[in-house]
């Protein structure tokens, strides 16, 4: 299984070698698969990840991104810098993990769609996005590495016969590689799906009836009220009114995207409103460092 995304965090339990998989076959194109995850930033120069019989390789194809944008703290490796690739790869082919703990709450068993698959990660995206020239190189390498399935959970174009990424997927199809691509985050109106190529499996979101819902009640200084339905994955809720502050208007912080850690105590006893953008998990973690009781993620275009 080849995941083309923002990289993975290789120490994640979803990619641990549990001893239940044989060594993978040699790449179809000969040679050996690249394994470049670099040092673990938590223990630099001490813990260098070595590929094994679950996560069998990792390569980065971000040369254009790094030269054009250059904001990736894990540049030059296949290590994930924003969590998206770790999420998509584990959803597709992550191990069975019996106790998935989120903020101290045991959420039970999780697993990917194909927990018995070998995983190869191809990093093509940085914090600011992805570029077709990097993606096409990764697709061609995945073909040479002998992957059976490519997952590409990233938006794309709607012109399959001229889009370079879609044409790279056509090469994969010709090499008997199944490509699964996301339909994107637009919609649900007509003509809002991405990856319309007839040679890909394009996957859209679906719904189910399991929900844990709560209401968010906002009261302005003039007494106006507004209630929105929200969701929470934490075990303990907020059971009393708290002030809501805008991250970008808070003295001593002024980061609308909440991408920098807040000073201790800055948001004590408050709910912080952060603008949507890269890495919503990191946003929550950063405001939590400042003592925030909760976070609201808002879309500035609505």
Predicted regions: what is each one?
Residues 168-179, 193, 300-302:
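Short acidic, glycine/proline-enriched helix-loop-strand junctions
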Residues 1-131, 145-148, 160, 174-176, ...:
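Subtilisin-like serine protease catalytic core
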Residues 186-190, 281:
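Active-site environment of divalent metal-dependent phosphoester hydrolases
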Residues 126-130, 152-154, 159, 237-302:
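Extracellular/luminal Protease-associated
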Residues 205-259:
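A short, polar/acidic, helix/strand-boundary loop motif
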Residues 150, 182-183:
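Conserved P-loop NTPase motor core
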Residues 179-181, 204, 294-298:
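Short hydrophobic alpha-helical runs that function as membrane-insertion/retention elements
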């Amino acid at each position: 299984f080849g995941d083309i995304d923002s990289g993975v965090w290789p120490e994640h339990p979803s990619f641990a070698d549990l001893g239940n998989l044989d060594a993978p076959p040699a790449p179809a194109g000969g040679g050996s698969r690249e394994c470049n995850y670099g040092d673990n930033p938590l223990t630099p120069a001490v813990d260098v990840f070595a590929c094994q019989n679950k996560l069998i390789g990792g390569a980065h194809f971000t040369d254009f991104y790094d030269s054009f944008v250059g904001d990736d703290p894990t540049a030059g490796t296949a290590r994930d810098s924003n969590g998206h690739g770790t999420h998509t790869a584990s959803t597709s082919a992550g191990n069975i993990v019996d106790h998935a703990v989120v903020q101290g709450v045991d959420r039970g068993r999780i697993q990917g769609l194909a927990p018995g698959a070998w995983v190869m990660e191809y990093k093509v995206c940085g914090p600011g996005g992805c570029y077709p020239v990097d993606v096409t190189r990764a697709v061609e390498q995945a073909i040479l590495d002998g992957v059976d399935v490519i997952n590409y959970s990233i938006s794309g174009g709607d012109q399959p016969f001229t889009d370079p990424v879609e044409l790279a997927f056509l090469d994969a199809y010709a090499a008997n590689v199944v490509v699964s691509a996301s339909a994107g985050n637009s919609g649900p109106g007509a003509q809002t799906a991405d990856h319309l190529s007839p040679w890909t499996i394009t996957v859209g979101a679906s719904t189910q009836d399991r929900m844990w819902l709560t209401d968010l009640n906002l009261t302005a200084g003039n007494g106006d009220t507004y209630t929105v339905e929200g969701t929470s994955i934490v075990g303990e809720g907020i059971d009393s009114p708290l002030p809501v502050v805008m991250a970008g208007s808070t003295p001593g912080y002024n980061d609308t995207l909440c991408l920098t850690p807040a000073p201790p105590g800055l948001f004590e006893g408050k709910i912080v409103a952060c603008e949507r953008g890269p890495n919503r998990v990191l946003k929550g973690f950063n405001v939590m460092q400042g003592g925030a009781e909760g976070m609201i993620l808002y879309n500035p275009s609505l």
